[in-house]
Swiss-Prot record:
Assigned EC number: 3.4.24.64
Physiological role: Catalytic subunit of the essential mitochondrial processing protease (MPP), which cleaves the mitochondrial sequence off newly imported precursors proteins. Preferentially, cleaves after an arginine at position P2. Component of the ubiquinol-cytochrome c oxidoreductase, a multisubunit transmembrane complex that is part of the mitochondrial electron transport chain which drives oxidative phosphorylation.
Signal peptide: none
Region feature Disordered, mapped onto this chain: 30-50
List of catalytic residues: 144, 214
Name of the protein in question: Probable mitochondrial-processing peptidase subunit beta, mitochondrial
Encoding gene (name): MPPbeta
Amino acid sequence: MAMKNLLSLARRSQRRLFLTQATRSSSSFSAIDSVPASASPTALSPPPPHLMPYDHAAEIIKNKIKKLENPDKRFLKYASPHPILASHNHILSAPETRVTTLPNGLRVATESNLSAKTATVGVWIDAGSRFESDETNGTAHFLEHMIFKGTDRRTVRALEEEIEDIGGHLNAYTSREQTTYYAKVLDSNVNQALDVLADILQNSKFEEQRINRERDVILREMQEVEGQTDEVVLDHLHATAFQYTPLGRTILGPAQNVKSITREDLQNYIKTHYTASRMVIAAAGAVKHEEVVEQVKKLFTKLSSDPTTTSQLVANEPASFTGSEVRMIDDDLPLAQFAVAFEGASWTDPDSVALMVMQTMLGSWNKNVGGGKHVGSDLTQRVAINEIAESIMAFNTNYKDTGLFGVYAVAKADCLDDLSYAIMYEVTKLAYRVSDADVTRARNQLKSSLLLHMDGTSPIAEDIGRQLLTYGRRIPTAELFARIDAVDASTVKRVANKYIYDKDIAISAIGPIQDLPDYNKFRRRTYWNRY
């Protein structure tokens, strides 16, 4: 009986095996039948081999490199790291920035938020210390002071009282490439603020006694700036990095120029640089675009029409980066301060966004703020744990045709060697050891920082004015975030290899810096032996 059962099981197994083979054979026949008649059995190619994981990774890398080497030309003008489009829905849902260009070339740009109770209106001018000569260096800053010293319609006192009576705030600042005059007022005083701005920019009197009085004020300001070592370090950094070029000049200018600037110099600077085509009227908050445009048409009627553009001026005197250093030993200072920088990207360079992410990856840290030792940045974590600095800050400065990317640090004299090694180690590491987690963290921190910075009408107006002067348009937040999200670890490595790895550096240092390594040691640490 047991033998019969075994034989029965054997027959069933053979029957199942036969049915399985028959099914497989019929599938093979079906596949052959589906081949076109013109193809002979011998023409059948063997099945392709399975794609190995490293082959798949190599294909992804090739596609990314292809995108990086052949970016969409539409984005080259606007600093996109590689072609990627933002969602149109997000862009359209953001507050609209409306721009109107008047016949004389003056641009009026607004972002309306009628629920706000305040507004900021200002004039952003494509003029700064970069567009001066050695003889006139300091004129732009001197003019910023003199512009509030009375017009044909308003005395100095009347101007100050008018702004105070409406609860407003009037201010100005000068940088290397831009000058700005702006007013923050209540929603009912926007037209009055525009009238004040138009008056001071077109009808300032520049009385000789006022000029002489302001000359002394600026000389005292220069003494105050010389006492701010961080300002001195960064001014010296520009002077050595861009030596013998316009970007190397200071904003305040040398003392001998301040002592010799005349009324004619101020008037000539306005005529040649405060031109309609180089100016943007920006407004944000409780403003209506049509009303602002009409007011600007009515008020800004005396602007110069000099055809010279900043692009022509930059082309005539381009910035040139020079690997070099400047050191000032001062043992009276309690701490040493220094900055080390590489040549960075311009505003419109496709790599500028990646450098912003890299700046965030390096981060900043201050011993007195209490940020903690276990922060996300490898550099700040190394500095904090080993206690080799009082503060440290990565910076990324953009200009029309170049930039500066580097680190500024404050430390005790006996920590300089360890600190300089840590800085160069972590900065150079960006060229070949970057994790996706670090890049993602930096992207999120950067986006958060940008959003927090845009809180208020004044930062929004400043953003509008600056972007129209640098990009020619206002970049929507959603589009900017899409560009930031397009930066990954491979992008960071590529950009770091382009701007950092084995590249010249500029160094500026002040204080008890005898133990700061020499230039050649810094330079050798811009590369590693990776073999």
